[in-house]
């Protein structure tokens, strides 16, 4: 298995994504409507919107957990399904197996001499010294770091994040944001982050996409240097622009987004 530090340069590049005329309906309810989107290789994109707007459905389609009703999902010019081995997904829950030690959770499903790479992945997220502990001994933030290490060991070119920081306290959340941003800069994968937190979106993403009632309502480039100064006037202005647009959407209580049961075999961060 190739070490994270020894990846050939072409593997340090993210996957370019193209979403064309995408629709997703559950019965008579159309959740996504004619989504067209191009994401360059290595871009960090945050997807925001009210609950039930369709953002998590979009991520599930990109992850291959659901199939579009209409439209195409492409990795460059090839079907996105061809890039599943290069794709990893993280959820709000770390989904660690409590009967396996931390390092074994990172190497879950791998064969051969995977332990050095698992330890290297844990080192990348700052948890190498906890490798032989049980998940129950970890905090919520540490468990998410393990889930991130479990994704990194597979050298992903596309990382899909479905509100992985939503259950963390404010300080731990900022630390995890900074870690994800650092690793993204180091490894160059393409990132799509679904989040309810607009401040999080503008703080770490290159681009913020607002989903309104199943359509793209705003596509905002965050053209600010990194690392970004939290609380700066320019960052606050961008956050206000997105929030004002979100709050301008009629606030009738949305239906929860439908979803299909998870398949038995799933490449989340494992």
Swiss-Prot record:
SMART domains: AAA. Transmembrane segments: none annotated. GO terms for molecular function: ATP binding; ATP hydrolysis activity. PROSITE patterns: ABC_TRANSPORTER_1, ABC_TRANSPORTER_2, SSUB. Pfam families: ABC_tran (PF00005). The gene is ssuB3. ATP binds at residues 49-56. PANTHER family: ALIPHATIC SULFONATES IMPORT ATP-BINDING PROTEIN SSUB (PTHR42788:SF17), TAURINE IMPORT ATP-BINDING PROTEIN-RELATED (PTHR42788). It catalyses: ATP + H2O + aliphatic sulfonate-[sulfonate-binding protein]Side 1 = ADP + phosphate + aliphatic sulfonateSide 2 + [sulfonate-binding protein]Side 1. GO terms for cellular component: plasma membrane. Part of the ABC transporter complex SsuABC involved in aliphatic sulfonates import. Responsible for energy coupling to the transport system. The complex is composed of two ATP-binding proteins (SsuB), two transmembrane proteins (SsuC) and a solute-binding protein (SsuA). Belongs to the ABC transporter superfamily. Aliphatic sulfonates importer (TC 3.A.1.17.2) family. It comes from Pseudomonas syringae pv. tomato (strain ATCC BAA-871 / DC3000). InterPro entries: AAA+_ATPase, ABC_transporter-like_ATP-bd, ABC_transporter-like_CS, ABC_transporter_ATP-bind, P-loop_NTPase. This is Aliphatic sulfonates import ATP-binding protein SsuB 3.
């Amino acid at each position: 298995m190739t070490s994270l530090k020894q990846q050939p340069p072409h593997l340090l590049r993210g996957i370019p994504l193209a979403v064309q005329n995408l629709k997703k309906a559950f019965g008579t309810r159309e959740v996504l409507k004619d989504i067209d989107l191009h994401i360059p290789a290595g871009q960090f994109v945050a997807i925001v919107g009210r609950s039930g707007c369709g953002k998590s459905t979009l991520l599930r389609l990109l992850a291959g957990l659901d199939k579009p009703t209409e439209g195409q999902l492409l990795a460059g010019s090839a079907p996105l399904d061809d890039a599943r081995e290069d794709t990893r997904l993280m959820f709000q829950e770390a989904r660690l197996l409590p009967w396996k030690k931390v390092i074994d959770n990172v190497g879950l499903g791998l064969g051969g001499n995977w332990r050095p790479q698992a330890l290297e992945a844990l080192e990348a997220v700052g948890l190498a010294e906890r490798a032989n502990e049980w998940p129950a001994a970890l905090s919520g933030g540490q468990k998410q770091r393990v889930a991130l290490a479990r994704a990194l060991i597979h050298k992903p070119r596309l990382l899909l994040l479905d509100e992985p920081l939503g259950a963390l306290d404010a300080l731990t959340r900022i630390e995890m944001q900074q870690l994800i941003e650092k690793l993204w800069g180091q490894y160059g994968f393409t990132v799509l982050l679904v989040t309810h937190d607009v401040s999080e979106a503008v703080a770490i993403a290159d681009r913020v996409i607002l989903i309104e009632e199943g359509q793209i309502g705003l596509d905002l480039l965050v053209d600010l240097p990194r690392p970004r100064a939290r609380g700066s006037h320019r960052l606050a202005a961008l956050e206000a622009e997105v929030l004002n647009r979100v709050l301008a959407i009629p606030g009738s209580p949305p239906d929860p987004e439908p979803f299909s049961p998870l398949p038995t075999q799933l490449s989340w961060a494992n």
